[in-house]
Curated annotation (Swiss-Prot):
Family stated for the protein in its record: Belongs to the MurCDEF family.
UniProt keyword terms in alphabetical order: ATP-binding, Cell cycle, Cell division, Cell shape, Cell wall biogenesis/degradation, Cytoplasm, Ligase, Nucleotide-binding, Peptidoglycan synthesis
NCBIfam families: murC (TIGR01082)
SUPFAM superfamilies: MurCD N-terminal domain, MurD-like peptide ligases, catalytic domain, MurD-like peptide ligases, peptide-binding domain
GO molecular function annotation: ATP binding; UDP-N-acetylmuramate-L-alanine ligase activity
E.C. number: 6.3.2.8
UniProt-listed InterPro entries: Mur-like_cat_sf, Mur_ligase_C, Mur_ligase_C_dom_sf, Mur_ligase_cen, Mur_ligase_N, MurCDEF_pg_biosynth, UDP-N-AcMur_Ala_ligase_MurC
Protein name (database record): UDP-N-acetylmuramate--L-alanine ligase
Localization of this protein: Cytoplasm
GO CC list: cytoplasm
Lineage, highest ranks first: Bacteria, Bacillati, Bacillota, Bacilli, Bacillales
């Protein structure tokens, strides 16, 4: 039996796919850079070997699954081609894997990971379900009927999939290094829609998605009256959100989610719509929606000292706005401080004013240096260009996160798609030191 070798195994999709193959009984290994990524924890728990990149890792008997961030000139891929080993790109392998399941591809400019996680949780509790989530989580469930997968639009990679269903959460202009306009993004989504076998579930409040023309049913969901599935009577509380759902004007039920913001209501509504279409019991869907704990790096909360620290993947103006609004719903009486690390120079330059406008919805803003990508390590702007447009003109360094101590009782949002987590980790060490120092002072006073 072949051994599957993943080039770039710490990538979020790659990590999840490696776990799926491992669960299905295949022998799996992979390689990547030495740097720690949150995705590797699950790999280590399953004892999947992780090596440092080297041509010497490539031996006879391997099937190479190559991450999309790595060109054919990468040393391991080059060696594999020299040896005549099978080399297949991540998205193409996944496209083949989902055949034979009732597959549900979740795509959209924003909300893919959260919706895939929610769908996997709900459907997986009702019927056996395999899943691949963009937070690095994957499961190759034995006897699975369903396969839920996050489908990324970047470079049109999702066109490798021919799923049974698709959920389209929204269309927005992102990845400006590849997509030239929102029309370009729309064309990619419509092309995917034409490959879907049974039905597309699309946000009907999104003007772009309303333009879809397909030969299969398009089931629209949203807040507007014209949607087939409509969320009404939304009640936002500090413990979560309640809402009623109507299907073609008929009351379907009252639902509750332990999540915040309109975007999470819409994510849940898409799952409710698909489950209804598939005939899954509505009472089971209600029950499972209540127990979803979220996905990694999406409004992940840590309470430390007297502050609330939130880790979030938000890296686009629309996502930052949604994250700030969610924080205000859950913590209405707290100051909101945004710590943001822009991801890629092209995106930062293209959406510079949009980033400023969204960040300025917070009470205070701190900016980290721009995080480049494997494809784009430098650019013709600096973080100062964005800082000049935001409240306070603050730029924060990993070595000096103690500046955030100025905001007792605040919610501090660490946002970004790069390695903004290192800023949170550094700040948590500062807080730990502060707590220890305070304890020492109290002890001295007693003595």
């Amino acid at each position: 039996m072949t051994i599957y070798h993943f080039v770039g195994i710490k990538g979020s999709g790659m990590s999840a796919l490696a776990q799926i193959l491992h669960d299905k009984g295949f022998q799996v290994q992979g390689s990547d850079v030495d740097k720690y990524f949150f995705t590797q924890k699950a790999l280590e728990e399953k004892q999947i070997p992780i090596m440092t990149f080297s041509a010497d890792n490539i031996q006879e008997g391997l099937t190479i699954i190559a991450g999309n961030a790595f060109p054919d000139t990468h040393e391991e891929i080059e060696r594999a081609l020299e040896l005549g080993l099978p080399v297949i790109r991540y998205h193409k392998f996944l496209g083949q894997l989902i055949d034979g399941y009732t597959s549900i591809a979740i795509t959209g400019s924003h909300g893919k990971t959260s919706t895939t996680g929610l769908l996997s949780h709900v459907v997986g509790a009702i019927r056996p379900t395999s899943y691949l989530i963009g937070d690095g989580t994957g499961s190759g469930t034995k006897g699975a009927e369903y396969f839920a997968l996050e489908a990324c639009e970047y470079q049109r990679h999702f066109l490798a999939y021919k799923p049974t269903y698709a959920i389209m959460t929204n269309i927005d202009w992102d990845h400006p290094d590849y997509f030239k306009s929102v029309d370009d993004v729309f064309n990619a989504f419509e092309t995917l829609g034409k490959q879907v076998k049974k039905a597309v579930f699309a946000l009907g409040d999104d003007a772009e998605l309303r333009k879809l023309t397909l030969d299969i049913p398009i089931i629209y969901f949203g807040f507007g009256e014209e949607n087939e599935f409509q969320a009404k009577n939304v009640i936002k509380e500090t413990t979560g959100t309640k809402f009623d759902v109507y299907h073609r004007g008929e009351f379907l039920g009252s639902f509750e989610i332990p999540a915040y913001g309109d975007h999470n209501v819409l994510n849940a509504l898409s799952v409710i719509a698909l489950c209804d279409y598939e005939g899954l019991p509505v009472e089971d869907v209600k029950k499972e929606l209540k127990t979803f704990e979220g996905v990694k790096r999406r409004f992940s909360i840590t309470e430390k000292a007297n502050q609330v620290l939130v880790d979030d993947y938000a890296h686009h103006p629309s996502e930052i706005r949604a994250t700030v609004n969610a924080a205000r719903q859950k913590y209405p009486d707290k100051k909101v401080v945004a710590v943001f690390q822009p991801h890629t120079f092209t995106r930062t330059r293209t959406f510079l004013q949009g980033f400023a406008d969204s960040l300025n919805l917070a009470d205070e803003v701190y900016l980290c240096d721009i995080f480049g990508s494997a494809r784009e390590k430098t650019g013709n702007l600096t973080i100062a260009d964005l800082a000049h447009k935001t409240k306070g003109n603050h730029i924060i360094k990993e070595e000096h996160t103690e500046e955030l101590l100025k905001y007792p009782e605040a919610v501090i949002l660490f946002m970004g798609a790069g390695d903004v987590q290192k800023f949170q980790a550094a700040y948590e060490k500062v807080l730990d030191h502060e707590v220890l120092t305070e304890a020492d002072l109290k002890k001295s006073a007693i003595n």
